[in-house]
Amino acid sequence: MGTTRQSIIRGPGSVTFGGVTFYDASGITAEVDSSTSDVPSSMSGKLDTIKTDQVGKVSLTPVGNLSEALLAVLFPDWLKTPEIGRSVFGSADAPLVVHSRAGQKLTFLAAALTKCPDILLSPVKTAFGQAEFTALLANGKLPTDANSFYTVAAATYDLGEPPRSGLSGFHYAGTFGSLSIPDTVDGWTVSIAPRLDPVATDSQGTIDYTLGGVDVTAKCTPLGLSESQILAALPVLSGRGASLAGANDLVIAATGGLTVTLKKATVVTGPLNWGTTMLRAGELGFTAHIDVEDGKLFDVEYTDPA
């Protein structure tokens, strides 16, 4: 007998984590990987393969709805004001649920945000790139224990569809000290990249990650800036060994949209171009530094206009 159409499993779903339901723009992917190692023999070659670890990854690009609750999950305070050396998973397990419209609920019992989405600031782009969550063993569990990593259960889908309100799409302007960037070629991209170090035990494999640092950058191709303005913004004339932690914050904002702040920013790249169809200003790159007064590295804020 051939395969029946009704036996093929497919269709969309949504992700719930930290009390927030995420609707995706282009699909949800869950990868559950078992790391392995070969057992070699000089006489016979590979004798066996053994399992060494287990890690899950759930990735999606959020649809773009803006809300304070969503921002609190995607850009948590422990990244805004980096708690270097902290446990990423913490002492209490935070479940992540992928619920399909077809009526199946996959629950990863211990999950954490491990890749922030890029923030895309443009009137013709939704606000977020791809986010990634990592799933590990539940706290104190061995891989062989019951309910140690995930559960699967039938459950009627009841999470609805993404709301039409709060969708992004705003014109953003940047301010950096006396430098004003009122318009760009194709908007701004802000990247927040946590540096995470895995923590493993001999009996369980990876059970946590430690926050080792956070890198925050922003880039845009500005319009209307002169050669002298771009060169003056670069630290070219700073002394060798001089600190590049600037006195000014980079603030990118739009009425009705987000306000993104890179603390104590500096311009690190700013090429100039000459050519028949080339724009003079190339892509400006900024990087953030921790503000020693309040410990903050960046901020992402949204005020609901309603």
What are these regions (language model features)?
Residues M1-A306:
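Signature of extracytoplasmic/envelope-associated structural regions
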